[in-house]
Amino acid sequence: MDSAETDTPSTRSTPNGPGLRQRKLRRTRDQLIREALELFLAQGYEHTTVEQIAEAVEVHPRTFFRHFASKEEVALTPISAIDEAFLAALEVRPAGENPLQAMSGAFRAVLGRVRDGELEGVDGALHMAMMRLVERTPGLLAEYLRRSEEMEGRLARIIAAREGVDLDDDFRPRFIVAVFKAVGRVVSREWYLRADTDLEALSVAFESALDSLRPELFADWRRPGA
């Protein structure tokens, strides 16, 4: 894994999928993520070293750093994968949906992929357990919240583009996204802390929480012609 590798017909990507080298790199990365999360859960984030993670996968620590800049990055990688999948799902929601409908639909779609094991590098039960660890690890929680704030900005830009409004002049995309994210955090946190791994029930609870909001939040405020 640490030796230099060059592209050959057996390692080069093809139209039919990644080559052997890419598959090996992907497999090593996935193993590093899983072993890291399991070690974090077993002995605590602070007490787990990069050397221990690398040893569990039987690679040199420098291989770890070829994939991740830090323990913090590997710990939050599954969360980032879910966020990216959510953004991609939102981009293709039907144009006629209002912002909350679009974000809710994207959330359901991604949660379904996690539940069915279809989101690469994300194990649903392991992710839920890791989120409980994030909640009680100050350093990880601070970085998670920082990334969540960045995510809100990206979501707001997508919503503004969908609705045909200028994000610099119209606060509603940021407002709607903040409401959506707040509901998601409150509902999800309850699931994490009580160790509930039923993702279908989580989806239902999230929808119920959104439905309890004032009807005005669900109104269609698209600019005519957008």
Curated annotation (Swiss-Prot):
User: Which GO molecular function annotations are given, in alphabetical order?
Assistant: DNA-binding transcription factor activity; transcription cis-regulatory region binding
Q: What is the recorded function of this protein according to its Swiss-Prot or TrEMBL entry?
A: Represses transcription of the divergently oriented tcmR and tcmA (tetracenomycin C resistance and export) genes by binding to an intergenic operator region. This binding is inhibited by tetracenomycin C.
| Organism taxonomic ancestry | Bacteria, Bacillati, Actinomycetota, Actinomycetes, Kitasatosporales
Gene3D superfamilies referenced in this protein's UniProt entry, alphabetically: Homeodomain-like, Tetracycline Repressor, domain 2
Where is the signal peptide, in residue numbers?
Answer: none
Please name the pathway. Answer: Antibiotic biosynthesis; tetracenomycin C biosynthesis
Among SUPFAM superfamilies, the record links this protein to: Homeodomain-like
HTH tetR-type domain mapped to chain residues: 26-86
Its protein name is HTH-type transcriptional regulator TcmR
Q: Which InterPro entries match?
A: DNA-bd_HTH_TetR-type_CS (IPR023772), Homeodomain-like_sf (IPR009057), HTH-type_TetR-like_transc_reg (IPR050109), HTH_TetR (IPR001647), MftR_C (IPR041347)
Q: Which Pfam families match?
A: TetR_C_14 (PF17754), TetR_N (PF00440)
Ranges of Polar residues compositional bias?
A: 1-16
Residue numbers spanned by region Disordered: 1-25
**Which one GO biological process term can you cite for this protein?**
antibiotic biosynthetic process
DNA-binding residues per UniProt? Answer: 49-68
This protein's UniProt keywords: Antibiotic biosynthesis, DNA-binding, Repressor, Transcription, Transcription regulation
